[in-house]
Amino acid sequence: MEKPKIQEVIAVEGRYDKNALLQVVDASVLELGGFGIFNDREKTALLRRLAETRGIILFTDPDGAGFVIRNRLKGAIPTGRVLHAYVPDVYGKEKRKRRAGKEGKLGVEGMPPEVLLSALRAAGATFEGEGATVKENPVTHADLLDLGLIGAGSRTKRAALLRALALPEHLSTAALLDVLGTLTTREELVEECNKIVANRE
């Protein structure tokens, strides 16, 4: 089976993440070297250039460290096309490791191929030979407020939504809004929230 080809460059934390992705897609994958990216000015400059020319997809682990790396890079790459791919919170350990990570979550390398592909599609990756899909009625900040996903008393409902959409728990409001913009429409989000409310009753 031929692997789908992606236009953007995918930036991952390490070599095992890179290997996992290259088994699923035909793409340029750049290793960040974990926290080492913070001191690597040349690689950061390369990421800026790639964001301007081809676009990049930040694909870090769903743990706290992955979000620190993602957020630091988001600030370091102010312009260009920067997409964010997320894998769900799945607890366990990768086969090559003796024990689970600090938070006990699987990283990019531990995810099944279909989860990786789904995360890339949800991020808005450009797949060669496929037309771009534009969602009508995108989700807005006001929608999140109206649906009780942000603001006072929103924690439980928001956590349930993140689980239902297979998104990591560390997602900020801005990141959630970005993801929902490519993943769902306003109507689909309302429907999902209604299911969550029905399941709690």
Regions found by a protein language model. Give the residues of each.
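Short, ordered loop/turn segments at secondary-structure junctions
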Residues: 16, 33-35, 61-63, 85-92
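Long, charge-dense
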Residues: 75-126
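A short, flexible N-terminal coil/short beta segment enriched in small residues
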Residues: 1-10
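Acidic, glycine-rich catalytic loops of TOPRIM or P-loop NTPase phosphate-binding modules used
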Residues: 8-9, 15-19, 23-53
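Acidic beta-strand-to-loop metal/phosphate-binding motif
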Residues: 11-13, 51-65, 86
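Acidic, metal-coordinating catalytic cores used for nucleic-acid/nucleotide bond scission
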Residues: 36-39, 59-69
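C-terminal, charge/polar-rich interaction regions
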Residues: 118-121, 125, 130-201
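Short Gly/Thr/Asp-enriched flexible loops that form oxyanion-binding sites at enzyme active sites
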Residues: 68-76
